[in-house]
Regions:
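Amphipathic helical "hinge" segments at domain boundaries
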Residues: 45-109, 114, 194
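Hinge/beta->alpha junction and helix N-cap segments in small-molecule ligand-binding domains
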Residues: 65-75, 93-101, 153-163, 179-201, ...
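Short, well-structured alpha-helical segments in soluble
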Residues: 101-114, 218-232
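Flexible loop/hinge segments that line or gate small-molecule binding clefts
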Residues: 121-166, 183, 242, 267-279
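Flexible loop/turn connectors
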Residues: 230-237, 242-319
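N-terminal helix-turn-helix DNA-binding module of bacterial transcription factors
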Residues: 1-58, 72
């Protein structure tokens, strides 16, 4: 395969002349014709990444994702990709495994890689996150969390929780168990939980609250430990669909998958509708969140005004 030096030698010009031609710079008509012919004859493909680094925009977008094999992440990324294709961006993914240090390093790595913008799907925002973001020379969009003065796309977590709490209370369920996550995640650990509590409180219902993990396997262990001696429960709530599925798994292993109780989750994961009985879930439009994030990031890249915070409504499934 020919490189830029080979093309320069064949044309009898310098490498800088070839580079100038490839980047749309000024060269003589004769040289332009000669280079066009040689490049076509030898099917020369310039290094697009190297070219992009010399240009004002690289057409590279960095997305920092917290989990793999996640319905929420998968759908959000699909939304991002759909808009990237419209604007000829290339998407780079950095998986952090819910590790805060890895998220910080990913922000710095993408900045050094000269991406045009960054989409951060964070579960927690620390002071260090904010310090790094403030120093970056590229726009950043948050998805799933919000913070003053940062552009963000969020789901209406409080309303989602309130809907579930109100639904359970209206059915006269009194013995309610909720498996939540750490309050370090403000959206799920604080807002969603508070919505549930407030919705139940309307009916004078106060749930038993346990702390667990976003990770399905860890949630299964926590659920098993807390429910092994429990009885008479009317409703069980998982802060996410994977946690709700962990609850369902526990009862199915107890040969009580169709007992006199109802399980609720959040996210709209298709798996919740494949189990028996189906789990009642609040559906979040993750794909739309991805498209909104990328469209707003594109506006910021070109110094246009973008909405500071977008709240996406939730939908109810199997109520």
């Amino acid at each position: 395969m020919k490189n830029i030096s080979d093309i320069a030698n064949l044309a009898g010009v310098s490498k800088s002349t070839v580079s100038r031609f490839l980047n749309g710079g000024s060269v003589s008509p004769q040289t332009k014709e000669k280079l066009s012919r040689i490049i076509e004859e030898h099917d020369y493909q310039p290094n697009q990444f190297a070219q992009s680094l010399r240009a004002k925009h690289t057409n590279l977008i960095g997305a920092i994702i917290p989990r793999m094999n996640s319905h929420a992440v998968d759908e959000t990324v699909k939304g991002i990709v759909s808009v990237c294709h419209q604007h000829q961006y290339q998407l780079l993914l950095n998986y952090t495994g819910l590790d805060i240090r890895a998220e910080i390093e990913a922000l710095e790595t993408f900045s050094r890689s000269k991406v045009d913008g960054i989409i951060l799907m964070a579960t927690t925002l620390t002071d260090e996150h904010l310090e790094v973001i403030e120093k970056l020379n590229v726009p950043v969009i948050l998805v799933g969390q919000s913070y003053p003065n940062l552009h963000s796309i969020i789901h209406d977590d409080y309303q989602a929780g309130f809907i579930v709490g109100e639904q359970i209370g209206s059915k006269k369920h009194k013995n309610v168990v909720f498996f939540g996550v750490s309050e370090e995640d403000v959206a799920v650990g604080v807002k969603r939980k508070q919505g549930i509590i407030d919705g139940l409180k309307k009916y004078d219902v106060y749930p038993e609250i346990y702390l667990t993990s976003f990770k399905y396997e860890e949630a299964k262990n926590d659920v098993s430990e807390k429910l092994k001696n429990a009885s008479g429960i009317h409703a069980l709530i998982g802060a996410t669909d994977p946690i709700a599925l962990a609850i369902h798994k526990f009862y199915s292993q107890q040969n009580n998958a169709t007992g006199n109780y109802q399980i609720f989750g959040f996210g709209g994961n298709p798996m919740t509708q494949l189990v028996t009985p189906a789990i009642t879930t609040v559906k979040f439009n993750y794909f739309k969140a991805g498209t909104y994030a990328m469209n707003q990031l594109n506006e910021l890249i070109f110094s246009k005004n973008a909405v500071s915070k977008t709240v996406i409504p939730v939908e109810i499934e199997n109520f």
